[in-house]
Amino acid sequence: NVLDACRKVKVEQFLMPSSAAVYGDLAVLPLTEELSGMPSSFYGLTKLTAEGYLRIYREAFGLNTVCFRYANVYGPRQGDGGEGGVISIFNRLIVEGKPLTVYGDGEQTRDFIYVEDVVEANIKAMGNTSCTGIYNVSTNTGTSVNELITRFRAISGTDFMVYYENERIGDIKHSRLSNVKAERDFGFIATTTLE
């Protein structure tokens, strides 16, 4: 077990990437670290379970564990598979001249954070003893899928087709993560906007 090995060799800090998926579809926004997770996907449940292991190791053995709940990360060379890559999926389809498919009415929101901001959060946290426990790594800004489409139309200069289909079971309607705790404890503020 990695946590046992870290404890035995006295690792000073263990940082684990987690996900906004641990929250599920909670009605309160912004989502804060203190909220109890109600994952609506196996991915979110797996991340929440791993967070539980880290909490127990911190409490039982004093291992400084940090969980970063990443918002929807985007950036260069991102794969366009899976549910988290809507920006890269839309980008590829637009470049290929294909229509976009939106599940639901397009008013669902996500907190999109640029990959370089995520890297910056990790760097700021490493070795910082005041950084312990769970943190959201986010912009605290909700952007709807329809807003993304409007931005893609402006950038591409094309009026591509968009098809709306029924929302998928388990999809989260709104997600916006508070970044107050990360700013307070280790000075992290995302600087990149979708513009």
Q: What spans do the regions from the language model cover?
A:
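C-terminal substrate-binding subdomain of Rossmann-fold SDR/epimerase-dehydratase oxidoreductases
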Residues: 92-195
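Activation loop
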Residues: 19, 27, 83-86, 90, ...
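Residues at the N-terminus of a long alpha-helix
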Residues: 38, 80, 111-114
